[in-house]
């Protein structure tokens, strides 16, 4: 049951609030809540409560002085200009008319008035103190406040904890300190505590670092108190500061000023909170240095490690190779050229010495693709002994510090510049199951480099550097000297729910402006508690056993949100797509067909989720898959086709599953969940949904319903996109995915729950708007309100807790149809016929226009077809001519082929005949040569025998002559005749006979040799004749270009030549 809320308005007069905006502030007070109990002193130790000075005013001032860490400022306070009113109307005129108003006295009035004691941020005294607020800071100053003290808290964003601290401090503080509070009007300003007597600044808290702001409940002793929490000393200690207002109504105005500060940003772009705008001649150069750590993902790539949003630390895995990526970008002053990086260093711990830094291996350096920054990449081996501290698993309750440094050579600077980054890290087990989030995975630090220009006489030549380094300071070092506080404010408001006014999230750097939130915004983390994953794993195991029955605990788990890693599978099971193979096959056929709405699809996909990396690239994989799904559905559903907005739902499904499965789930949502009914019959069912929503508003939010009636704001003006796109078009993705979880589980009626939740949480803002302002709020401010994931979770919890019965919705549906019937019956028939006639005339004109377009298209098509036909006929004639020529060439080629085949056969026959003849001649010559050789060998043997016999006979004769005394004298010792004349007569006769015999034998041998030579000459002549015939045949073969025959003749010639040589 929703709690009732009382609404009170504070009207601001021009006499008391001349410096305030001309807006009425709506204060929604919570009733029925339990008042925080007052604790005794025993609770101090548990909560870290510290009553400043135990009630001593001197001790209280001393404690506040310790909080202040800024050095004294010499700036003199100037006259503070009045604030411009945001609204128009009589109040604005009154403000301008009474522009000269005396400042409110700093001394407390003896009798409190009901008007708010607000004064311009201007000192009363002409002599300003060292701690006077900055003169150019636009702020609102509140008097008559009492500072009750501060306490340390562990849950800085907890409203219950803050109210408890407020109750304890108010009850236990005996002596308090009167202060003046200065609240800036922009988020770049600073909340300041001033001494009401001397206007001296006691403490300051930058507005962008305040975490939480809360006021006491009406009807309790703390109703005149408010408090805010801030992170003390660089977010390591959280404190709550409690104040009491002498006039209770001022609490609402103070909280409203805090909310205004967070809604507005300064129009100029200051480099820092206190620095003056710099000119190109300034000696301070600002650099933005970001650090990103990447780890080996085991697939050959390096992926950025996640960053814990709560602890602001990197999550590293033990023993995994890493890369350090540093990006340096100059953001202010004249551009300095970075020449190179000559060192990337790393060391565990913080505030380390230069000697403790260890050099990393540089992989690459150079300008980024857009040329705006300089990127350095280095490899980091965590297994090195130097980095053992950051390679051991870190306990869950601890974090480690790591220092990274990069040394850069800047062309215009005389010496190298070192940028030093200190970050927190946690080391996990290498096997730990981590779901990497898509959130920001880098840390960024701003550095302020002060340079001094070198005088001309000090430079050696014109090529020397122009500057020398005076100092280099980071933004963190600047803030360490100040009292720090932390980034976002949430103002609790009472009512049917506890809604908070969020400030910009910590990781959102874009300013609040009038530009709507881009669709596809929001990083969805895949991290999930192990216990939740185990619960879902058990549920899915049971569900797969019987897919037709949903498990009992499914609804409660879905209300808490399906884990991102399991959404693809769970959505298909919820939609009943576990057995839809026919849709998958049909999808593959549908994408090959043409869609009549192709142009509309192409136009819409370029506007779908431009803030998401998967869909932002024109012609990329994401847009291509999205185009296929929308095209396939437009062909599948011929009655409805493609309607504007379907691409957003298809894109959400495509982020969790492949194309085929996404198409199947889209078909199920359109048909089984009834989404396509909204597009039918001229959106008749959609108008019924609008009527149901307005009736629910009338029942649940009657004041907002009446306000919308007063400003003539109808449901179709702001809720059309909610129903047609299922909230997928404008809201962050983590919220969209949760809505789809609920829709697939509980049906399309979930839209009413979410719509009522949005209207409830925005009721207070909508009640202050007019028609134009309400439309702008729905278009711009409402989606931006849920850039914080915590706000989105609270909205979904509220939506799930809102009970809307189906019986009630059917009742409203019957009322709508009855109302439509009554309108039709009460309507004048003539007016109805005239309206129908106008509709038919418009339809007729549209059809005539379409007919003209089709006729024009037909004529154009006929002309194009005639031209194509003429070209085809010309091409056919040319091809026919080419065909006839080719046929004639084919006939000639066949005749030539036959002729050559006949000649080839004749040549083969002649070659075979000549070859046989040559072989016979060769055999004959071989036999003759063999016989000749045999005769020669016989004659040689015969000659040798005769010579041997002659030698034997001569030896015998010599022996006989030696034995004869008379003949011995005729021969000498060598056997030669001494005297020829004496022996001539005796042996002439024998010698002549022997010579004659030998001559006869020699003549016979010469005769045989002559005959053999003659036969050899005849054989050579025949061989020459054969070679001549072969030469003629060879010339004919060359003429016929038959290489195979040429090779045959060459082989025959070669063989014949070899045999002829052997014959010789």
Curated annotation (Swiss-Prot):
Chain positions with Phosphoserine modification: 42, 355
Keyword match Ribosomal protein: no
Residue stretches making up the Rab-GAP TBC domain: 561-747
GO CC terms, sorted: centrosome; cytosol
Keywords: Cell cycle, Coiled coil, Cytoplasm, Cytoskeleton, GTPase activation, Phosphoprotein
Domain PID: 137-293
Acidic residues: bias regions: 505-515
UniProt GO molecular function: GTPase activator activity; small GTPase binding
Broad class of where this protein is predominantly found: cytoplasm
Site positions (Arginine finger): 603
Region (Disordered): 1-101, 478-520
Coiled-coil portions: 805-1038
Modified residues (Phosphothreonine): 991
Site entry: Glutamine finger: 644
Composition bias type Low complexity, residue spans: 7-22
Subcellular locations according to the entry: Cytoplasm, Cytosol; Cytoplasm, Cytoskeleton, Microtubule organizing center, Centrosome
Quaternary structure note: Interacts with RAB6A and tubulin gamma.
Function, in words: May act as a GTPase-activating protein of RAB6A. May play a role in microtubule nucleation by centrosome. May participate in a RAB6A-mediated pathway involved in the metaphase-anaphase transition.
Domain notes: The arginine and glutamine fingers are critical for the GTPase-activating mechanism, they pull out Rab's 'switch 2' glutamine and insert in Rab's active site.
The name this protein goes by in its record: Rab GTPase-activating protein 1
Organism: Mus musculus
Gene name per UniProt: Rabgap1
